[in-house]
A protein has these predicted regions:
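Short, composition-biased motifs enriched in small/polar/acidic residues
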Residues: 713-784
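Extracytoplasmic surface signature
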Residues: 3-715
Length: 784
């Protein structure tokens, strides 16, 4: 038997190359969508990889706002990406490669903290603004005649005019005197020789009344004839002719279905055209391609993408995209491969994310294989529970294909399963407010009256096959639940539900008993500790006890905790956690026991205190404030709908170590267009990892669709079998689930060399080091 000639060292957490925040290594990489999480509008081939731009923030496992690259296996960010403001619905609309560098145009305004007004250059390391541009909304970039053309609405530095076209030669901008209105813009451009063709929503260009379509003849702007009171969808030069698509059946007096060719004097049809206007035309040495919502060309069925063979249009593939989804941009790689991007969630019936490659016979989605994103559509998580083997989540979903509802799912052995059918509610929107695992049984509570077509009022138990009612109980909507390991406690009716006689009840597995009736407002938080039950909500009376929003059930009766919480309208306690003699309460309130606090307070058994010092530290919120609390190893984790903690910009999720407030890595992010501030509604621990649920697209530098996993204490370990394999040791890393890492080796513990990179798709993870036949040391290094 061979003896092990190596010593294995424990995991070390250090900053990997390019890591802005090394703690982002603790965020699980598996909960992003398999490709892009939003539509793609642009694509270009650069340095052997596909670059895609659009209105997305996640690409595979990574946070990648606006622009991402595909290396053939994985999606990656491009620097800090390109971001818009929360009032803009699209980000990157065009990409081009000029002079060996990547250029992006769109409606973005920044990359990270750097201001970039709509036009940017990527040098392989950083995004930067182009000289001379004061502001820009770029719709199309085009490389022609050794120059870069930008079309849209651009303003040059020191110039008050707005231009529809600008040409960059590397030193200066030439505008062709393309002055247009401030709110107008050019949507497409084509260049042939010195002639520049444009189309857009303008009525005057260079002080000349020319509506929608024009061309620059080298000296002046002229009307491009053919269309009246409408624009072209796209323009392209192919085989010496100008091709234009739009919504027309006639152009320049000739019949043409949504596509025509201009020879400099007249318009001509291009075969039978299409039933819809192509979104983009791509000229290649092998022919002209068209892409869009294309279904017919004369009697020929078209599958969204077609190639012109000189006499007719031929479809690329069949039955590829669902009816309401389609690609809208094409890209040709240097090696002849064709890519399509757009707005589509499936390809050939396979899960996709807005990007695909033509294999020569069919379209193939460009996806990573390790995605555990629950849906490719909308997802908002309201409740989480976990046991040793499974994660349970309850929330609202909307699939791209149209299905939507409220449901509970189980994640076990890296496979999601929907538990039963949807939850519905007569008279209002259903809510799955709380999940609890007790003695191997899963309970779901909230506002619902029906589960999978069976009548169940607000509380259900999963029996392994279907949802069942719990005992003979008539209760109102449930706002909170907790278990002491034997008994299940429920608090009725969150604020907003009109239910008389809200109660706190206990289920012992056989029968119900009431701990409090006539609670005058909703219960939204319950916590159990050391034989005591804590309740929080919007109430001012619980049973016969006057109590402001928080109380404790102790020795068979309710007691107050000081003077409770007060503040402006909507005062409520929504989360409680107990740590020894300290009780932490979070929600929406200004004072606790008369002490000034910001939505978060600590009860020491005698009086209330702010969390942090001074009291203005607290947690600042625009609306709902704190919705979830948990404690581990002396750290208080706070989740909710807030923008800052401890005077710092820390949105939605914060950690307090007793002295300082910090983010978890670089923190959670919001959707810039729809929900700029992320929201956390629920948290739960599973061994050494914290699960976070709510409404957000990313956690740290990872894409994470409303569900994220933070590994608080990575427990990575290296080991080897007892024998060699092919004269080399096979090295095993365990405790790596959801983590990226580097394995390094050394012969002297001074100089370390990277052996390989890995990621925890499987646990344990193994690799073979051909150099391991000689003595050496190994270590693993976490990498964001």
């Amino acid at each position: 038997m061979n003896r092990l000639p190596a010593i294995f060292l424990a995991m070390g957490l250090v900053r990997c190359a390019g890591a802005d925040n090394p703690d982002d290594a603790r965020w699980d990489f598996r909960f992003g969508r398999p490709a892009l999480d939003g539509g793609a509008l642009a694509a270009v081939w650069h340095d052997g990889e596909l670059f895609v731009g659009g209105a997305f923030q996640g690409a595979g496992a990574n946070f990648a706002p606006g622009v991402a690259r595909w290396d053939g296996t994985n999606w990656w960010p491009v620097g800090e990406g390109l971001s818009a403001t929360n009032a803009i619905g699209w980000t990157v609309t065009s990409l081009a490669v000029w002079e060996h560098e990547l250029y992006a145009g769109g409606n973005f305004v920044r990359s990270g903290d750097d201001w970039l007004p709509g036009l940017a250059r990527w040098n392989g390391t950083n995004w930067s603004a182009l000289p001379g541009i004061a502001a820009a909304r770029v719709r199309r970039l085009l490389v022609q005649n050794g120059s870069l053309f930008a079309a849209g609405n651009l303003q040059l530095a020191g110039d008050t005019n707005y231009y529809g076209v600008a040409r960059w030669n590397g030193n200066v901008w030439e505008t062709y005197d393309s002055r247009i209105g401030r709110t107008e813009g050019i949507g497409c451009i084509a260049v042939r020789g010195e002639t520049v063709y444009v189309s857009g929503d303008f009525n005057v260009i260079a002080d000349t009344a020319i509506p929608y379509n024009a061309y620059w003849n080298g000296a002046t702007w002229q009307l491009l004839p053919g269309l009246t009171n409408q624009t072209f969808r796209t323009l392209a030069i192919h085989a010496g002719g100008l091709y234009g698509s739009g919504s027309f059946t006639h152009i320049g007096g000739i019949a043409a279905n949504n596509l025509a060719r201009w020879d400099g004097e007249s318009w001509w049809p291009v075969g039978d055209g299409f039933d819809q206007a192509p979104d983009r035309l791509l000229s290649t040495p092998s022919g002209l391609y068209a892409v869009g919502s294309l279904k017919q060309s004369g009697s020929t069925t078209i599958n969204n993408v077609a190639r012109w063979n000189g006499s007719a249009w031929q479809s690329l593939g069949a039955d590829t995209w669902p009816a309401a989804e389609n690609p809208n941009e094409l890209c040709l790689a240097d090696d002849g491969r064709l890519f399509a991007v757009g707005y589509f969630f499936s390809v050939q019936g396979q899960r996709a994310g807005h990007a695909a490659e033509w294999t020569g016979t069919q379209w193939k989605p460009l996806v990573v294989n390790n995605s555990l994103a629950l849906t490719d559509g909308f997802l908002s998580i309201f409740s989480i529970a976990a046991d040793k083997d499974s994660l349970f989540v309850g929330g609202v979903y909307s699939e791209p294909a149209g299905a939507s509802g409220r449901a509970v799912w189980q994640l076990k052995s890296n496979v999601w399963a929907k538990l039963g059918g949807d939850f519905t509610n007569i008279g209002g929107a259903p809510v799955i407010a709380s999940l609890v695992v007790q003695n191997g049984q899963l309970f779901a509570g909230g506002a619902f009256t029906n589960v999978n077509h069976a009548t169940i009022h607000h509380l259900a138990r999963w029996d392994g096959d279907q949802w069942q009612p719990v005992g003979n109980i008539t209760n109102g909507p449930i706002g909170a639940m907790v278990s002491d390991g034997t008994n299940l406690f429920i608090g009725e009716s969150p604020a907003g539900f009109q239910v008389n006689g809200r109660t706190v009840k206990r289920w012992d597995g056989h029968q119900w008993s009431t701990l409090a009736d006539q609670v005058n407002n909703g219960i939204t938080a319950l916590a159990w500790a050391e034989g005591d039950l804590y309740a929080g909500g919007g109430f001012t009376r619980i049973g016969t006890l006057a109590a402001n929003r928080i109380a404790v059930w102790k020795n068979g009766q309710w007691e107050t905790l000081g003077g409770g919480m007060d503040g402006a309208a909507g005062v409520t306690v929504q989360a409680i956690v107990v740590d020894g003699t300290n009780v932490f309460a979070g929600g929406r309130f200004a004072t606790a026991g008369g002490v000034a606090v910001n939505n978060l307070a600590r009860w020491d058994g005698a009086q209330w205190h702010p969390v942090g010092s001074p009291p203005t530290d607290g947690v600042w919120a625009p609306a709902t404030a704190i919705m979830a609390l948990t404690i581990r190893d002396g750290n208080l984790y706070v989740g909710g709908f807030f923008t800052g903690a401890g005077g710092q910009n820390i949105p939605a999720l914060a950690r307090f170590d007793g002295t300082n407030w910090t983010r978890l890595g670089s923190g959670l992010r919001g959707w810039e267009v729809a929900t700029p501030v992320p929201r956390v509604r629920t948290m739960a621990w599973q061994e050494n990892a914290l699960w976070v649920g709510g409404l957000f697209p990313a956690a740290g530098n990872k894409s994470a669709v409303s569900l994220a996993r933070w590994v608080a204490h990575p427990a990575m370990r290296l080991s080897v079998p007892e024998s060699m394999e092919n004269e080399a040791w096979r090295i095993r890393a365990s405790g790596v689930t959801g983590l990226r890492f580097v394995v390094e080796s050394s012969t002297d513990l001074q100089e370390w060399t990277e052996c390989t990179r890995g990621q925890g798709d499987t646990d344990p993870w193994e690799f073979q080091d051909a150099s391991s036949s000689s003595p050496r040391f190994y270590r693993t290094v976490l990498c964001p």
